[in-house]
Amino acid sequence: MSAVSLKPLAVLAFAGTTLLAGLQPAAEPVPAPQADAAKPAASEPAAHVSRTARLQAFLTGRYGKDAKLSGQWRGSWTQDDETRAIDWQVCAEQPVVTGDSWQQLLAVCGALVDGAHIDPGTIEFFVLQPKGDGFGVTSELTGERFGSGGQPGTASIIRAGSDFYGFRVEDGWFGQGFSLLSQTLVLPGPKGLTSTGNVRSHIDNDAQYECENVDAAADPDTAEDCRTRRFSIDFALRFDDSDRSARIWPLLIEETGNTCGGKRVRQEHRFTLDPKSWTYSFPESLRREGCE
């Protein structure tokens, strides 16, 4: 089984060797013939451009001169005819092998500078391929909203098939004692990058005010009420890679934890990507906010 929590695949190194051409000196210096002097000089071999240099050039061209591979830079984001200040940063990047070539996956996260609690952040996704001395865009998905408080959550790169890669986003909402975390899969499809579905990654009400400090000395009725209503459940996402040659691997979600009344939960859900809609048919129970 291949879990998305495992460290990303080792970054591929692409290096080139510059070839140097030289002439052996003649035994005696002899003036070159006039015809030879008129010949055009042989073209120099193309200089190797590193992957990081290509990435930096793409970021600068897309986001401006302040964009960088490491750390934040200030920019702007226009959505619904409103332009707001935003702090951008690269939140996931990895080269991947696809067939007999390679691609560069890139996610750029944006956090609103003055985001209110209800405001989401944004993440922009790119699949790039080498083109000349830079990168060309094979597919992109921009303007996607995630998270709260102006923060977009986190992005990671996943392997979902033999040579099929995409992105996983985890974001959440916290309030009134509840934690509601979700995970979204963004995968390349026939029409480019697309959001294929959204499910919970974790839910709990551990910080509910009236139950946060309940202990053995608490009123029995209060303690029982809190125990009845308390829940904490994880939804771990991974891909079934038992057939490693399969183009797209089945998706597994393992639901574990405690539901209301202290009942233990442990069950596995299995899904396949619909080839027509390019989505996973997740049930509402995997998007719930509390006990079933």
Each predicted region: which residue ranges?
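Bacterial N-terminal signal peptides
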Residues: 10-21
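Acidic, small-residue rich beta-repeat scaffolds with periodic aromatic anchors
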Residues: 22-78, 175-292
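Short, solvent-exposed coil/turn segments at beta-strand boundaries
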Residues: 98-103, 131-132, 158-165, 189-192, ...
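Short N-terminal edge-element motif at the start of the domain
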Residues: 82-160
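Contiguous hydrophobic, core-forming segments of folded domains
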Residues: 148-195
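Short beta-strand elements that form the blades of beta-propeller/WD-repeat-like
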Residues: 103-113, 163-172, 246-255
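Bacterial N-terminal signal peptides that target proteins for export
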Residues: 1-12
